[in-house]
Structures are given as C-alpha cells and as structure tokens.
A protein has these predicted regions:
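Conserved post-catalytic alpha-helical subdomain immediately downstream of the catalytic base
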Residues: 1-26
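Nucleotidyltransferase catalytic core that binds NTPs
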Residues: 21, 25-181
Length: 181
C-alpha cells in the first residue's frame, strides 16, 4: 500500500523522480479528504472569503436555517437561493440553537453531519455554523448582496434585511416542512 502511494506521488512529477515521506503523507491525506470539507468554513474564513469574492465582483447570496432533516423542499429552496447570485453561503444553526428553536430531541443530525451533507449539495458553495439565537452578526460580517428566506417570512421582519442589498422570499414546497416535527 505504501509503495502504491509513493507511485501515486512520483507519476505526478516530470521525468525521473522520487517521493519524500512528507509528499506521500500529504498525498494520502488528500485521498481521504472530502471536497465537502473544503466548503465548511469558520467565521474568520467566511469573512475573508466574502471579502475576496466581493473584490472579484461576485454576487453573494446568504440564507440560514437548521436543515435538520434534509428533504426535497430544502434542496429546491437552496437551488432557488443560489440562482439569485454567484455564491451561496449558508449559515447553519448549531446543535444548541436548533434545540432552543425546535425543542428537546432536536436536532436529529449533528451540526457537523448537517454541514457535511449541505456542503455536498451543488447549490451550496459554503457552510458556516453559527451558535447565536439569530444570524444577525453573521449577516453583518458577511454583508451579502442578497438575503434569502422562506416564504413563511412574508409580511414579517427578517433578521438582517437591513444589511443585505436585497431580500428574496422563496415559497416552500407543499408538504415538505419538518418544522413542526
């Protein structure tokens, strides 16, 4: 197995070459790393990334939620959210905040499992977990161009709408909400 890893490093080089132990270890690590991991960011990382994206004239879309029991309605919602800009950043409620919002016994899936699944979706570019009761501070830090929420927010005050340039409300898919379960 070690020889195969070393061969994997060497074939990527030009001409006759050798592989150092560090190169082999790094190569093995890259084989075991999921691309989803690269899309889950810390607050500091997402702030730096959003600044960089804006400098490249990318339109940033932000949404947030618990996304505890992922279903087709969530996927459609996220696909629609992504269509409003170039990059979709999803603020994911921490386990503590999901319990506070939905009650004991929730979340069903841990914050890391939820983040991993969401980051694997084509529509979601980045996931950042937040522990506050609302995403206001996160939205303030990112300063998205577009803030997206579900259609159930129609006629209601949306946290962070004073920060984003634009607010979009997306209708839910009938029969697909797990908010009351």
């Amino acid at each position: 197995e070690f020889a195969n890893l070393a061969a994997g490093v060497v074939v990527g080089k030009i001409g006759s070459a050798t592989a150092t132990l560090n190169e082999i270890i790094e190569y093995e690590s890259s084989l075991n790393k999921s691309t989803s991991d690269e899309h889950i960011k810390t607050l500091d990382e997402i702030i730096a990334l959003s600044t960089e994206l804006k400098a490249r004239d990318k339109k940033i879309v932000f949404t947030n939620g618990c996304f505890d029991i992922l279903h087709a309605g969530h996927v459609r919602y996220l696909e629609t959210a992504k269509s409003y800009g170039d990059v979709l950043i999803l603020g994911l409620n921490s386990d503590r905040s999901v319990t506070a919002l939905k009650g004991e016994g929730r979340p069903i899936n841990t914050q890391l499992d939820r983040a991993y699944i969401l980051a694997a979706l084509e529509a979601v570019d980045y996931v950042v977990i937040f522990d506050e009761d609302t995403p206001y501070d996160l939205i303030k830090a990112i300063k998205p161009h577009v803030l997206v929420k579900g259609g159930d927010y129609k006629g209601k005050e949306v946290v962070g709408q004073d920060i984003a340039d634009e607010l979009k409300l997306v209708q839910f898919v009938d029969g697909k909400s797990t908010t009351k379960t």
